[in-house]
C-alpha cells in the first residue's frame, strides 16, 4: 500500500515530525495522542508503554490512524493494528524509531503498535 507514496511522500514520513495516533476508546470516542512513528513498507510502527490506553484500545478494536501535519503538508495512514510484544519485534521498532528521532530511554514494559496500512490520504504530491 505504501507504494502509493511518491518520493516526496516518503521524504515527508522520514522528516523529524511528531504525529497523532487515533484509536477508538471503549465508549466509542476517539482517543488521540501525540506519537513518533516510523513507516517501513506497508507497516507503520509506534513504540509505547504496554499498559497505555492506546494499547488497550488497539487490543479491543484493532483499528488505528496516524496523522502527520507540517504547515500545509499532511499525511494520514489508516489500517488494522496489532500489538507486538516479541523481543525481536520490539527491538526492530525501537531501531527504526531511533533512526528517525533519537534513541528512546530503556523501558522494560515497551511494546510496539504495528499498523498495516490499508488507506493513505495526504497532500498533493505525496500520493501516486
Question: Where does each model-flagged region fall?
Answer:
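Short, flexible segments with low predicted structural confidence
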Residues: 8, 29-31, 94
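Charged, gly/pro-rich active-site loop segments
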Residues: 1-4, 71-128
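Generic structural signal for secondary-structure transition and capping sites
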Residues: 17-18, 63, 102, 120
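Short beta-strand segments
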Residues: 16-49, 58, 64-67, 76-77
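A generic structural signal for short, non-catalytic loop/turn and secondary-structure boundary residues
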Residues: 14, 59, 68-70, 106-108
Amino acid at each position: 500500500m505504501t507504494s502509493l507514496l511518491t518520493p516526496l511522500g516518503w521524504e515527508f514520513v522520514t522528516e523529524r515530525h511528531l504525529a497523532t495516533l487515533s484509536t477508538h476508546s471503549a465508549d466509542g470516542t476517539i482517543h488521540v495522542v501525540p506519537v513518533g512513528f516510523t513507516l517501513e513498507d506497508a507497516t507503520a510502527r509506534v513504540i509505547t508503554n504496554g499498559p497505555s490506553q492506546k494499547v488497550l484500545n488497539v487490543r479491543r478494536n484493532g483499528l488505528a490512524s496516524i496523522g502527520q501535519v507540517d504547515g500545509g503538508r499532511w499525511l494520514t495512514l489508516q489500517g488494522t493494528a496489532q500489538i507486538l510484544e516479541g523481543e525481536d519485534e520490539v527491538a526492530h521498532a525501537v531501531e527504526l524509531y531511533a533512526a528517525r528521532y533519537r534513541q528512546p530511554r530503556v523501558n522494560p514494559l515497551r511494546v510496539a503498535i504495528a499498523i498495516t496500512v490499508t488507506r493513505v490520504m495526504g497532500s498533493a504530491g505525496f500520493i501516486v
